[in-house]
Swiss-Prot record:
Keywords: ATP-binding, Chaperone, Cytoplasm, Nucleotide-binding, Stress response. GO terms for molecular function: ATP binding; ATP hydrolysis activity; peptidase activity; proteasome-activating activity. It comes from Shewanella pealeana (strain ATCC 700345 / ANG-SQ1). HAMAP family: HslU. This is ATP-dependent protease ATPase subunit HslU.
Amino acid sequence: MSEMTPREIVHELDSHIIGQQKAKRSVAIALRNRWRRMQLAADLRQEVTPKNILMIGPTGVGKTEIARRLARLAKAPFIKVEATKFTEVGYVGKEVEQIIRDLTDSAIKLTREEQIKKCKFRAEEAAEERILDALLPKPKEDWDSEKSDGSATRQIFRKKLREGQLDDKEIEIDVSAPQAGIEIMSPPGMEEMTNQLQSMFQNMGPGASKRRKMPIKEAYKLLIEEEASKLINQEDLKEQAIELVEQHGIVFLDEIDKICKRGESSGPDVSREGVQRDLLPLVEGCTVNTKHGMVKTDHILFIASGAFQMSKPSDLIPELQGRLPIRVELDALTAGDFKRILTEPHASLTEQYIALMGTEGVTIEFTEDGIDSIAEAAWQVNERTENIGARRLHTVMERLMEELSYEASDKSGSVTVIDAAYVKASLDNLVQDEDLSRYIL
């Protein structure tokens, strides 16, 4: 797991997300607390539960982006899910326990990658020997294997193989044949049963090998994977992955405001209040049965987020509100924020368009007043129509660059300066006309 300090986490998030310091600090503290908890004595560690977070803010201000970036920093099992995808147990749709099953699958993948790294050297050696055996088959006579391995010819070929001189040469090798996939049609909500049936049928088949002809470079990669998988103990892998989920797992619940109960609705609300009730045991702590084993959710961190434009946090059922003790409000974006978004983040929008046009040999230069005008145009459209936050910049930029993108292949070697006048000529009519803005921007 990540050992970054809160300050380092915020600094890393700053290079991708503008503003929203409160939200960044909250997730940074929550992530660091995971590390702090693991430094405690075992009996005290069991008592320290994560403080789940609820992020509240309008659409397009960075809630989901914080989750995406956090996933890369966490170095722990992480899953982002939409709360609207789930329904109450017994109805058509995904059950909330699928969240933990998916989280466990991601932990299995993470753990396998770590174990492959540890045994990569041994796997590379074994793969190298198999390729040399294919290149230099041993004579049928019962020669001493050590003498054969150390022969001058074998060492010459080993040197050439390591230097990449044999990469394009084709060889025939025996590789594990992929198990035939068995597709089982099942109704929504029955995914777990389907997975168990599929794994049962696949395990019934013998582990056959197949002879294939391929370049040495491709064969080497394939054999490394095959040899590494032989060195990994599958039972240990599952145990480590489950431990990783239970102690370090993070679940990001997006669009949680969409499962708030509507005041005017009547009858069962299977995709709203029912889902909230089903989420309660997960967030509070329960045991979920997965195909890899039983997973306890007591110490999994839940971060929920929602725009809450049509509802408010108090519309969530009280029990769920109590399980999300830390509330963070994200600020709406201003024209100044838009300007910073266009220039400051790593791989900003302006950098992306400069690089894209550069592939056609076209040079683009954004002036200071040009960027100001783009930011102002996006902010104005958000104020007059629906406020979709920073996503409006994508729409405005695409409209601004449309003509240039279309003609770029015919303008190789040209230089285009995007200043306030260029932006005004391209966008002014659309920004001023509210009806056009509604449909085009």
